[in-house]
Amino acid sequence: MDHFARVSLVAALLYTNTWAKTVRETLRITWEEGAPNGQQRELIYINGRFPGPNLVWDEDDDVEVTVINDMTQSVTVHWHGLDQRPIQPGDSFVHKFKAFPPGNHWYHSHQKMSLVDGLYGAVHVRPKGDRKGLWSQISQDDKDIEAMEKAACDPEYLVVSDWSQYTSDEYWKISNDSGLPVFCLDSILVNGKGEVYCPGQKFLQGELAPGVLDAFPPGTEVSDKGCFSPALDRIKGGPWNMTERPDLIPPHVETGCVASRHENETIVVDPGRNNGWVSMHIVAAATIAQIAISFDSHKFWLYEVDGNYVNPREYFSAIISAGETFSIMMKLDQEPGRYTVRIPNTGASQVFSAFAEMVYKGHEENDKKLGEARLSYGGVPTSPEIKNNSYFPWKLDTDHMSPWPPSTPRPGNADEEHLLVLGRVGSPNNHTMNAKYLYPLGFRDEEPLLFYPNATLGTENEGLLLRTRNASWVDLIMQVSTLAGDEVAFKHFIHKHGGKTWRIGFGTGVWNYSSVQEAIQARPNDFNLETPGFRDTWITAPSASGEKHWSVLRYYVDNPGPWLLHCHIELHLMGGMGMVIMDGVDAWPDQLPEQYRLGKRL
């Protein structure tokens, strides 16, 4: 979500902002007991609620958010654009920025794995521009166009997260102590509500997506929680020079499902408003899961991805990966009543699901459910028609949803090219963004690069950085499945702070070209510079049998600052899959305002 990319701390010093209204918010963060899926554990509350409040602003508002940390551990609230030291227990910090760009965004923690503990919420920046050209692609009717604009400015919010009965510290300790990639979860939550389902091992085995078992030895089965064993060679990779301790994985983490009934989210929609149109902003506040979403007997138009408008396309279901945001528009044209919203995990990590209900206004007391399912419990489309009209991030014809209004990168060569080799190194839980370097999450916490940009020069830590020049075009070439022990690779959800990128290339094999231009000439069908997608989170291809893949991301440096590039799977980021891009470092100011400093030591 480079949701406030153009209002970074550095950019704020370089550009003059126009006057706008000032909006002030306060977020008080506490650590309390809760049971969002019916099972008790400690978690993070924001202003006494989980997840945090939806924050709604108008484009170009001057926003001031005071974050008060009433926990006993340090924390950050991350707007994908601010660089600061963690907020210590008992301290506070005031974030100041322009509400830009318009669209569907979110906020969350970037301190260790505390996203796992519940620090997240939705952000909506209402636009001031005219979007008739967007809605007219859905309907030519003037009433519909006006109604969709109103619906988009007053959407329903669906914050979808995965959930474990273990805190982030406990979960990471289990992975480290066992030496295995533990990724089994308990629930998927919608707006902080959900249950734990235990339909039985045989049922879950039958819900595996077609082709998944082909990647495993014959006879491989999932557990009664729908998880593959982390000790499988296809899961842990390697061989690694280390000792595995599966006996240190506690009961009920991978096996031993314990069901609990609680409460699922109910979304009340009104077909009498906005000519029957409703908009929904969906935030994938997940830590591991790659979820799908469908609404029984309803179709929807996907019109925004990662806070950027796209030329709308109509789907029965859509898959959204950790860290992404989608906005959809739906016509409430079915029989009034109660419909199931299905939110299954679709990745190979686990077979589990969640449900919510969409209820037409006036039918809240009607318990009868209407409609036909679009997805199975395991996320498999229920018919060829559903499959052929669903959004899949690994299919280029759907994944490359072109921006609206049109936005294209410079053709030909970029000014700078950087080859990044992603994967595991040394153990199942060590992940790198650039061949060997592991990014520690506490890197430069006490002396942030924003204040000390030259601190790593001449040291090995310079390998954790890229430096770019302002007003330059940059290509990031990402190679997967080539590191020893990581030939069979899990997908990664790669997110760049500070600005979006166009994915101009996506192909198989080992990248062995001297330049992107040479690759374009050799493999023109693997590149798209005319209508490429434009977003801040991209999915790398998984490798079930050792096939190699690469992607090329292009962007223009117009937002100077120290920006994190990382995998949005929390276990991968915690294991080192991150680096800092020092964009436009030649344009950074010599002096920073005192209010950007947190603590007296900076």
Swiss-Prot record:
Binding, Cu cation 1: 78, 495
Organism: Metarhizium album (strain ARSEF 1941)
Residue numbers binding Cu cation 4: 492, 495, 567, 572
Protein name: Laccase 1
Gene symbol of the encoding locus: Mlac1
GO MF entries: copper ion binding; oxidoreductase activity
General function of this protein: Laccase; part of the Pks1 gene cluster that mediates the biosynthesis of an anthraquinone derivative pigment that contributes to conidial pigmentation that provides protection from UV radiation, heat and cold stress. The polyketide synthase Pks1 produces 1-acetyl-2,4,6,8-tetrahydroxy-9,10-anthraquinone though condensation of acetyl-CoA with malonyl-CoA. The dehydratase EthD and the laccase Mlac1 further convert the anthraquinone derivative into the final conidial pigment.
Reported cofactor(s): Cu cation
PANTHER family the UniProt entry points to: LACCASE-RELATED, MULTI-COPPER OXIDASE
Compartments (UniProt record): Cell surface
Positions of glycan attachment: 176, 241, 264, 388, 430, 454, 470, 512
Chain ranges passing through the membrane: none
PROSITE patterns: MULTICOPPER_OXIDASE1, MULTICOPPER_OXIDASE2
GO CC aspect terms: cell surface
Binding positions (Cu cation 3): 110, 497, 566
Family statement: Belongs to the multicopper oxidase family.
Domain (Plastocyanin-like): residue spans on this chain: 30-128, 157-345, 461-584
